[in-house]
A protein has these predicted regions:
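Short boundary/loop segments of OB/S1/cold-shock single-stranded nucleic-acid-binding domains
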Residues: 1-15, 76-78
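A short macromolecule-binding patch
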Residues: 36-44
Length: 78
C-alpha cells in the first residue's frame, strides 16, 4: 500500500523538468517544464532536505493553489 498520495498517481500525471532557480533562504524556486515555469516551495521536495540545486532534474505533480499552478511532490531524479 502506498504511503504518500503522489505514489498513487499514474506516471502519466507526473511530469519532468529542471530546477532553474532556487532561493534557499526563502525556500522558493522554479521548475522549467518545456518552457512552462512552475513555482515550488521547499516543503514540496519529497526527500525532506528542503534544498535543491539549480540544474537538478526532477519529477513532480502540477497542482493549483490560490489560482496559481505550482509544482508539488518533487522527486530528484538520478
Amino acid at each position: 500500500m502506498p504511503t504518500h498520495w503522489w505514489s498513487m498517481m499514474s506516471e502519466a500525471e507526473r511530469r519532468t523538468g529542471t530546477v532553474i532557480d532556487f532561493d534557499e533562504h526563502v525556500g522558493l524556486g522554479h521548475i522549467d517544464h518545456g518552457g512552462d515555469q512552475l513555482l515550488f516551495h521547499c516543503v514540496e521536495i519529497v526527500d525532506g532536505t528542503r534544498t535543491i540545486s539549480v540544474g537538478t532534474s526532477v519529477s513532480f505533480v502540477v497542482v493549483t493553489r490560490f489560482g496559481v499552478r505550482e509544482a508539488s511532490a518533487i522527486d530528484k531524479l538520478a
